[in-house]
A protein has these predicted regions:
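Cysteine-centered catalytic environments shared across enzyme families
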Residues: 1-237
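ATP-dependent adenylate-handling active sites, centered on carboxylate activation for C-N bond formation
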Residues: 55-58, 137-399, 412-427, 436-442
Length: 443
């Protein structure tokens, strides 16, 4: 007589954590179970979902937040644990008496833009099947920067419109603001939306981190706001360099990539300061995903990349090399699908509800439609100058607002002084990775 497998699913993500703007959570789960995965694209907002139909389980997430799972073995069959954090999975396994099966490298990240299907059939567990639900057409816009800019900023403004519409008018809105292109575009688009709705811009604040008196971002932010006449929105959050703890950031984001650790470290300092000043503040927008969309990363810093690979590979910076590639990490995913934790995890640590409009499919689709190869003609310099032109022209055509354009600078470089950066960062990635593993050994 064949033994009947009894599978359990332990979902640690409450429905209240879903930020779906246009349907109930159960309706979104129904789309996840439908035959055509493209239906998941109808879900507006931020989500990390699981749906079950017998032995079949499907998972999907938006690009702005993580979704992880672990398959444990029980006497009667497999147990699937689903959470947005590795330590939550570890703790759940320990409570269920399966702590000995856990290792952080055995956890799996659901890759963004895919439906992940798992069959709970018991030992041996089959590999998951990935079915893409977001596949925007590439390079379909004309090589006209005015048209490109207008298309891209219209998509940005639509995401901001949907976000603002879902938040009670009494709730204040903040932007994590450096004066750079992406946070600047979000601030101007949000300011424009509030005016269009007949609401006071006093509801809005631009928060800038200043470590040890301020790095280059503080001066840049002040110049940006001065040139746009929005000085009244500015709030500076002061923090000492001693408060920057990259090892604490490793624990929060559960990753060890140096650039993400550095970004999360300064992000934690900024969010901590906002929370101390405003105990009840919830809603914060940021510019995360803007660099990925318009491919504004220095290719020279990555020996694995060429300009051809950057402009010719679909959503390279959003997804990494893709789920079919050898280099794709099962534990972490790739690209912003992995790096989303640098913003999401710190925000959740301090009780904020984060919003990254550049990470939404509507905006990414507008970016993927840009004919990058035709526009750049193999030139790094043209590629690096493209984002400023696209955003500046687009914001002017859509909102009538003039976007100040400054040279690119990473958040962790602009928020701190050079001396503070040298003192707090620059450790070898092995140190961060070892620290992450040690956290689970202690657990």
């Amino acid at each position: 007589m064949r033994h009947q497998t009894i599978a359990r699913v332990l979902n640690l993500i409450p429905d209240e954590d879903q930020q779906i703007l246009n349907m109930a959570v159960d309706d979104a789960r129904a789309l996840l179970l439908a035959e055509n995965p493209a239906g998941v694209l109808r879900i507006e907002g931020s989500f990390a979902l699981i749906a079950r139909d017998g032995q079949r389980v499907r998972l999907a997430r938006s690009l702005d937040r993580p979704l992880r799972y672990f398959l444990a073995k029980e006497k009667d069959g497999p147990m699937l644990v689903v959470a947005d954090r590795i330590d939550q999975i570890r703790d759940a396994l320990e409570r269920e008496g399966h702590g000995g099966q856990f290792h952080p490298s055995y956890t799996r990240m659901v890759p963004a833009h895919h439906v992940t299907e798992i069959q709970l059939v018991g030992c041996p567990d089959p590999n998951p099947v990935y079915r893409r639900f977001f596949d925007p057409p590439r390079e379909v816009l004309p090589p006209d920067l005015d048209v490109i800019g207008e298309t891209y900023v219209q998509a940005l403004c639509e995401e901001i419109r949907l976000w603002v519409a879902a938040i009670p008018e009494r709730e204040p809105l903040g932007v994590l603001f450096s004066g750079g292109l992406d946070s600047g575009a979000v601030l101007l688009a949000l300011y424009h939306e509030l005016l269009a709705r007949g609401q006071s811009p006093a509801r809005l604040k631009a928060f800038t981190l200043a470590v040890d008196g301020g790095g280059a971002d503080l001066e840049q932010a002040r110049e940006f706001l001065g040139r746009t006449g929005l000085q009244m929105l500015h709030e500076v959050i002061e923090a000492p360099s001693a408060a920057l703890d990259p090892f604490a950031a490793v624990a929060v984001i559960e990753d060890y990539k140096p650039l993400d650790v550095e970004c999360a470290t300064v992000n934690l300092a900024l969010l901590r300061g906002i929370r101390e000043r405003y105990p009840d503040w919830r809603h914060l927008a940021d510019g995360d995903g803007g660099d990925e969309n318009l491919k504004d990363y220095p290719i020279e810093e990555n020996p694995e990349l060429t300009i051809r690979s950057v402009v010719n590979n679909r959503m390279l910076y959003q997804e990494g090399w893709g789920v079919e590639a050898i280099k794709h990490s099962l534990t972490y995913s790739g690209g912003l699908s992995r790096g989303c934790v640098r913003g999401y995890a710190p925000a959740r640590r301090y009780g904020f509800s984060p919003f990254s409009p550049f990470s939404r499919p509507r905006v990414i689709a507008a970016a993927e439609a840009i004919p990058f190869a035709e526009l750049t003609r193999g030139s790094h310099e043209i590629l690096y100058g493209l984002k400023g032109e696209v955003l500046r022209r687009g914001l002017w055509r859509v909102t009538g607002l003039d976007l100040p354009v400054f040279p690119k600078r990473r958040f962790q470089h602009g928020a701190v002084t050079r001396e503070a950066f040298r003192n707090q960062f620059g450790l070898h990635p092995v140190r961060y990775r070892s620290h992450l593993l040690s956290l689970h050994q202690q657990g």
